[in-house]
Amino acid sequence: MRRVLVVGGSIAAATAAGTLRAEGWDGELIVASDEEHHPYSRVPLSKQILMGTQELASSALPELPQDVDIRLSMRAVALDRMNREVRFADGSVVGFDGLVVATGARARRIAVPGQHGELVLRTRDDAAAIIARAETAATAIVVGAGFLGMELASTLSHRGLDVTVISRFAPLSQLLGPWLAAELTAAATRAGVRMLRAPGGVTLIGNPVDGVACSPHGALTADLIVSAVGDIANTEWLSSSGLAVAEGVVVDQHCVAAPGVVAAGDVASLRTGSGVSRRTPHWTSAVHQAGAAARALLDPPRPHRALPAPYVWTEQFGVDMKIAGQLPAPGTPQVLQGDPGQGSAVVQWRSDDGRPTAAASLNFRIPIVKLTSLAR
């Protein structure tokens, strides 16, 4: 294998490239990203950077080895697997012996065609746009109450904005389960954030956007409106490639999509033992998958297993919550340490036959390895 092409500029792309070099592979290595920025972490965008305690530049990931050819503003438009080539929007074509698909995902939008001014948070440029608006805003509406929506609401509230969160479902309940979701919702309410349910969904109004409409609440306006309603894997450029796509690029437990082609991060959809494929769009999953994907390219006969990392983390409304295991976690957990009522605890869920299935810490310092062990 003489040349590996990594398409993408995310943590998965950077980790895959770094792993190839760390494993001693010294062939030609190209990282082609559609962004104009060198690879960076998205984790602080909704937290420290939006809060203003860190500069945008601080999100940059560690530099890749100097012999890695990083090409920016390169948007992939087609993959020719037979000829082992990727075509880019500028007309250039890059051949490869091994390919890492790490094109990530983009923010899902709810604006109608031709409607301008919808703000989302996915990239550094998105963060810069929200920060610019927040500097003069007094009120904010966040549409969506998943991890990103709630973290946005937390940071904007901490900045002093009057924040309303609107969601179709109970905040975080579908992701975390009732107990954990209730803990974070209660913290949001204590912080003065209004939580509104809109089972029929939300429509953006104005052009440019200056409000929302939803039932049963009618029309609402705010100085700052941000949509946080999920993401869409960037797979369009693979439509004629013959690769299986189900929400993301379907890969096996070794992150292999096809011979010589691997995928990792938010764009990858791992096939489970039951045959169902699902994405796990979390930072730890991206890192784990990218390392395994790179090793699978180097060592196809003995690829490394890349199960979705059973660990997520969020920080919002004064709650530092780390969670390991199967989510959503049903019912009420057992308290192992601390006291949830006092704001600091370690809790655990067990199945009907007594097996640990999940564990979480709330403002409680515990090593990730130990927390993960409590979920198995």
Describe every region a protein language model picked out.
Residues 8-11, 122, 143-146:
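Glycine-rich Rossmann-fold phosphate-binding loop(s) that bind the pyrophosphate
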Residues 89-91, 215-219, 316-318, 354:
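Glycine-centered tight beta-turn/hairpin loop motif at sheet-sheet or coil-to-beta transitions
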Residues 1-5, 61-139, 213-216, 226-228:
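FAD-binding core/adjacent interface of flavoenzyme oxidoreductases
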Residues 116-137, 211-214, 219-287, 292:
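FAD-site-proximal beta/loop scaffold in flavoenzymes
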Residues 365-376:
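A short, polar/charged loop-to-alpha-helix boundary motif
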